[in-house]
Design a protein with these regions (language model features):
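Minor-groove-contacting beta-hairpin "wing" of winged helix-turn-helix DNA-binding domains
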Residues: 180
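Non-ligating segments of multi-cofactor redox enzymes
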Residues: 1-166, 175, 184-187, 191-194, ...
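Conserved N-terminal phosphate-binding loop of PLP-dependent enzymes in the Aspartate aminotransferase
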Residues: 171
């Protein structure tokens, strides 16, 4: 299910992001993010899985770690708390408002880009996607009501758990041996569908 088209789209948006940073116009990226919020209302968090430059580079880092056999640390329990994501979001909003009031440009997006990539070297991707990324927290709100999302067909699912294992955002949940995908946390990255041997997972 995951294909070359997705990779091409990710690389194109990553290149655009880098160009905006180099030319000092990274603030224009917010236009794409606002589009991502609008799209999330219907199509879930496709911004995260297909457009976000942070996620694209994190995928590359994870691939390198896997090839080199580098073991990742577990997500620190102190950070794996539901309220952490909202605390980070509050700090993000406060920084944004401060920037507007003072007129001083604060490189929030480049800083988040660096933090997300660095954390991936040491911890699972879910730490960033689920708890620390303020953009992801914002997108999780409209995504919770999205019509189209990744779904597990229960008639095909054999509860092998591979989808839960490969999900970078820990969006796959288990309730009485039944696997489901929490659409507010799902990145629509297609990793689960790509690894499902039963072909039980689809975007619909």
């Amino acid at each position: 299910m995951k294909n070359k088209l997705q990779l091409i789209i990710q690389i194109v948006f990553l290149a655009l992001f880098l160009v905006l940073i180099i030319t000092g116009r990274v603030q224009l990226w917010m236009g794409l993010f606002l589009l991502g919020i609008a799209l999330a209302l219907l199509f879930s968090r496709i911004y995260c899985g297909w457009i976000c430059p942070i996620n694209t580079v994190m995928n590359g880092v994870s691939w390198v770690k896997k090839k080199l056999g580098i073991k990742r640390q577990k997500t620190p329990p102190a950070l794996a708390r539901p309220w952490i994501r909202y605390l980070v979001l509050a700090l993000f909003i406060a920084t944004f408002i401060t920037s507007m009031i003072t007129g001083q440009e604060i490189p929030v997006l480049p800083a988040l880009f660096a933090i997300g990539v660095i954390l991936t070297f040491f911890f699972p991707e879910e730490l960033w996607h689920r708890y620390l990324c303020p953009y992801g927290t914002i997108l999780s709100l409209p995504a919770s009501t999205a019509k189209y999302t990744m779904k597990i067909g229960q008639e095909k699912c054999n509860s092998c758990g591979i989808c839960k294992k490969v999900c970078p955002a820990a969006a796959v949940e288990v309730n009485e041996k039944q696997y489901t995908i929490n659409k507010k946390d799902c990145l629509v990255c297609l990793d689960c569908a790509d690894h499902c041997k039963q072909e039980a997972i689809s975007y619909c």
